[in-house]
Amino acid sequence: MASTFTATSSIGSMVAPNAHKTDKKLMNKLSSSSFGRRQNVFPKLRRSSPAVVCAAKELHFNKDGTTIRKLQAGVNKLADLVGVTLGPKGRNVVLESKYGSPRIVNDGVTVAREVELEDPVENIGAKLVRQAAAKTNDLAGDGTTTSVVLAQGFIAEGVKVVAAGANPVLITRGIEKTAKALVAELKKMSKEVEDSELADVAAVSAGNNAEIGSMIAEAMSRVGRKGVVTLEEGKSAENALYVVEGMQFDRGYVSPYFVTDSEKMSVEFDNCKLLLVDKKITNARDLVGVLEDAIRGGYPILIIAEDIEQEALATLVVNKLRGTLKIAALKAPGFGERKSQYLDDIAILTGATVIREEVGLSLDKAGKEVLGHAAKVVLTKETSTIVGDGSTQDAVQKRVTQIKNLIEQAEQDYEKEKLNERIAKLSGGVAVIQVGAQTETELKEKKLRVEDALNATKAAVEEGIVVGGGCTLLRLASKVDAIKAALDNDEEKVGADIVKRALSYPLKLIAKNAGVNGSVVSEKVLSNDNVKFGYNAATGKYEDLMAAGIIDPTKVVRCCLEHAASVAKTFLMSDCVVVEIKEPEPVP
């Protein structure tokens, strides 16, 4: 039977209801005894520290070569799975989903992330090579499949040499030095991308989809090479492109009484002044000076504040309805620190000064000198757009540079995304591509392709372009012999030879996926000294790939080479694997 307790003490001690029945004589004896005086009758219980349970580990030593073979088996399983997507005739991979319909993808890094192998040692091998794909995706946004295939090549060729007794330390040093030298050679082969070539770069990355390539090229031409292009899931089966001009954010007018166009239910002002307040406006009297200036000047005014209380808002609405003022108000975008940053961005775009008490500015003493100016302002129920007049271009560029420095220091992807958003808003234009499809499964697959194409185009703008189709990597192999001469010893030169042989793997796999012999294709490509000559897997022809639009961004090829070499170095230096012993599942 459960006992009940009643709290009686002001400090929260609890006494049982029948405690008063305790024999008082007994208690007096205890309290007067030497035992009771010297020792606590009710000693505190010591809390026992929780036991630390460590899972047992299983050690796999590479004495007979079985551990490395298992690791390599994991690498091969992942690379073979991802490899089927490589090239214009690569296939799709169907991924099971716990919830909802299966996903059909053609994106290497998405496939790699889903792979978990049953054997723990093989799984570690797969995870190692997955790092090459993930890192390439983070830096270049494309080329993930090539990274995995190239890493597989480095590892396969390296394992053969190490198994024959070569020193893995010197071998990996040779791989590292050769890869570094080849990056320098790659930059010499690169050329700046022309506007007419942007569509080709995007199309190749999207699986030779000319429509996607043209749309991305058009988006970049409309917002500029350094403009911001974003993706959205469309509602129809067709792709669509539109450009949002000016600074747009998800905040609408605070009252529908401010509407100037009753059909569109929007507020539209030309040559508008802006008052920015980084606090809540509680008293309409604080606005008298600014509003009187607006009446005398005959200009429309937009107030952006943290919030506007009912009394102050009513005063603004009444003056607007009477026709005394052309006015509108909205709440500042964002929250907390981000809200203040947005207000500062708007101030720089419009030439305004933000009213802040911390810097000694008060609303009641504000005059025309703190107001900003916008060429156009459009407010709807949910969004607001401010188009600058171009007079603050230098200040905007300085602000963009500051934000770019913050992006380099930012660690979280979410923070980087928000900072990029701010750059887009300040730059005065965002192109939005709406990806359309017939079904949700097709939409997800198509969106991944468009995302890859967009990232590849941005990478091409950054570092230029080279010949695509795996031919640039194959041509780099011919530069290895000259690099070997500068290496310190024979084993480092063996490492260089490993790189030389592995560089043909991507081209051979592209050819294999197109149904032809990779070795024959690579020999025929190398037989022609023209660096632009190569195999077009989409048409099955040998031709000038640059003229045919088969182009890769230099940044993507560089990242593939660097990250594949890094993963191979880690792999070949490994000699022992530690994994957790799986606990047996409880019998139901």
Curated annotation (Swiss-Prot):
FT transit peptide: 1-55
GO biological process, one term: protein refolding
Cystine bridges: none
Source organism, top-level taxon: Eukaryota
Major location (coarse): plastid
Family (UniProt): Belongs to the chaperonin (HSP60) family.
Quaternary structure and partners: Oligomer of probably six alpha and six beta subunits.
NCBIfam families in alphabetical order: GroEL (TIGR02348), PRK00013.1 (NF000592), PRK12849.1 (NF009487), PRK12850.1 (NF009488), PRK12851.1 (NF009489)
Annotated HAMAP family: CH60 (MF_00600)
Function: This protein binds RuBisCO small and large subunits and is implicated in the assembly of the enzyme oligomer.
PANTHER family hit by this protein: 60 KDA HEAT SHOCK PROTEIN, MITOCHONDRIAL
Protein known as: RuBisCO large subunit-binding protein subunit beta, chloroplastic
Organism: Brassica napus
